[in-house]
A protein has these predicted regions:
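An acidic- and aromatic-residue-enriched active-site/binding cleft used to recognize and process polar
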Residues: 9-10, 125, 134
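Inward-facing hydrophobic residues that define packing positions of alpha-helical scaffold repeats
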Residues: 67, 132-133
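Extended glycan-interaction surfaces of carbohydrate-active proteins
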Residues: 1-108, 141-190
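Alpha-helical support elements that line or immediately flank enzyme active sites
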Residues: 48-60, 113-126
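Beta-rich accessory regions
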Residues: 121-131, 182-190
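Amphipathic alpha-helical segments of tetratricopeptide repeats
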Residues: 137-138
Length: 190
């Protein structure tokens, strides 16, 4: 679907193997570790699937598939406040406040909105880019109006701030979104 990239991995038995039994050119993961949930590779539907568009490495076909199947999917990524960091269809979806580590299990982050926005622009999806830019500007505008400051991340469905009032950092990327909407020069981020 243009969203996932996989690598074949082999898991060895729990016991450490003899060095002679290792196969050349084979990648062994977690040698000697017990098989538990947290040591297994999982395919999760997370926002970083859009990164190939931002990086410019997605083919036009992959980009089209991502936009159609993932960006436009309001049950998965496209929320009223922006892009969810994890699809709510995943079991670990959770928007509770968490500061250590910060919650990347569903809330909307401005840097994520921005990177997806830039990918959309790069591949010519201007209508979708405009939609995401407008959502992001509205989200931060409401936050500043209500609280006099910006927050680190937000609830996807209603835009309520979650944690860290006064957070600026990548929230300022919204200025590039506003400049793009106004057809002004956008500052190069890298």
């Amino acid at each position: 679907d243009g969203f996932y990239y996989s690598v074949d991995l082999n898991l060895l038995p729990v016991e450490k193997p003899d060095i002679e039994s290792l196969q050349p050119g084979t990648l062994y993961l977690h040698v000697g570790q017990p098989r538990t949930y947290d040591c297994l590779i999982q395919r999760l539907s997370v926002w970083s699937g859009f990164m190939s568009m931002w990086a410019g490495i997605a083919t036009p076909e992959q980009a089209k598939e991502m936009v159609q199947r993932h960006f436009h999917d309001t049950l998965s990524y496209n929320a009223p406040a922006g892009i969810r960091t994890l699809s709510p269809l995943e079991k670990m979806y959770d928007t509770r406040a968490s500061g250590n580590p910060s919650s990347w299990q569903g809330p909307v982050w401005i840097n994520v909105n921005y990177l997806v926005f830039r990918g959309l622009v790069q591949y010519g999806y201007t209508e979708e880019a405009r939609e995401l830019a407008e959502k992001t500007i509205l989200l931060l505008g409401r936050d500043y109006e209500r609280f006099g400051a910006l927050h680190e991340y937000y609830l996807p469905d209603n835009g309520e701030p979650v944690l860290n009032k006064g957070f600026q950092n990548w929230n300022l990327l919204v200025l590039n979104m506003a400049a793009w909407l106004d057809e002004k020069e956008v500052i190069s981020e890298f």
